Amino acid sequence: MKLLVIGNGGREHALAWKLAQSSKVETVFVAPGNAGTAIEPKLQNIALTAHQDLIDFCRNENIAFTVVGPEAPLAAGVVNDFRAAGLKIFGPTQYAAQLESSKDFAKAFMAKYNIPTAQYQTFENADAAHNYVNRKGAPIVIKADGLAAGKGVIVAMTLDEAHAAIDDMLLGNKMGNAGARVVIEDFLQGEEASFIVMVDGNHVLPMATSQDHKRLLDDDKGPNTGGMGAYSPAPVVTPDVYERAMNEIILPTVAGMKAEGHEFTGFLYAGLMIDKNGAPYTIEFNCRFGDPETQPIMSRLNSDLVDLVEAAIDGKLDSVAAEWNPQTAVGVVLAAQNYPDSPKKGDVISGLDKANQIGKVFHAGTATNEKGEVVTNGGRVLCVVGLGDDVAQAKSKAYEALETIRFDGMQYRKDIADKAINR
């Protein structure tokens, strides 16, 4: 069979790579893909992004099903368009994707269905937002309502930072339309985890747990990013936390969407904050697999991903199970110079073959120049994954592979997975 994956990041490289491991698969097309998907066995890039062009391609190539990687096409209704054309696709509808594309929608939904999350209020007026923050005090969290590539959240430790974030979004147009409304919520303390499941509208199949590292610099310093590394499994998600996350967050969300008349299908990602008592709170929802969490999670999946996606599309997720490698996977992101503000592009990358002999390199912001060299082409450039019998071994493997790679201005965190090692 032939499949299509929409997107061009590390998440899409990992999903396409895992789908291609199925004996049922002849080719996985990636639209538009990157320099890594261009050379991966059984993968083929296609330079298409418009929904109608993708629909025509799927019809002409007899594509069995499509998996959507990033949030932007979901928010733009790609699932609705494919379904209207009678094509199989795994992802949420435009309405359901509002759980990610509008923070205000998600918070109102959580309030309605009693899903644990931080107290909040939404503002379009800067003066009202400033007054609210003055009343609440710091630390406090300011979020752009719309999609901002993981960079629309400011954890303000002081009132000055909070007021500056409000002005940037509501008056300075720093986030464009995404920041025309802001959600201001209480600061939650605890340890974060990524809880990702597959949903077919009614049934839920949990993926392996993971923990992301959002901040640019070691010790969780610096600005928020799309994610600088992740590991799986996440020890903070104990069996008790797992049970509570399923019963208090995931299942009520799936039931709530159904009650709204919009069944949720696709990957559902709950970003959790787990407090000192082991109570999980929802920081955010994403309507797709996380990036970089996908890379370590897919590195541990022993099951045929094609079988799981087919079951989900057919509404039969209750008939399949996911088998996992008991090893730990650690993924470390290599970012371009000046990321996250204005990443430098076009720098030649060396050492990829050697790195792939030690671990697995998933490409994100990469392209090929006219000489055929792999070059930087985005903020987060690569994610290097190492597997090991414990977290320390997996971390060591990932960094051993990473150290063979070179490009100008390369930046990465040196403490990915240390929280798990130091537990």
How does the language model describe each region?
Residues 1-94:
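ATP-binding N-terminal substructure of ATP-dependent carboxylate-amine bond-forming enzymes
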Residues 21, 38-39, 90, 112-114, ...:
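Solvent-exposed alpha-helices and their adjacent loops that cap or buttress functional pockets
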Residues 44-50, 121-125, 156:
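Short acidic-hydrophobic, aromatic-tinged amphipathic segments that line or gate anion-handling sites
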Residues 90-152:
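A conserved helix-loop-beta module that forms one wall/lid of the active-site cleft
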Residues 152, 156-294:
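Internal nucleotide-binding/catalytic subdomain
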Residues 245-268, 286-358, 369:
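Active-site "cap" helix and flanking loop/linker of ATP-utilizing ligase/carboxylase catalytic domains
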Residues 366-371, 375-423:
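Generic C-terminus detector
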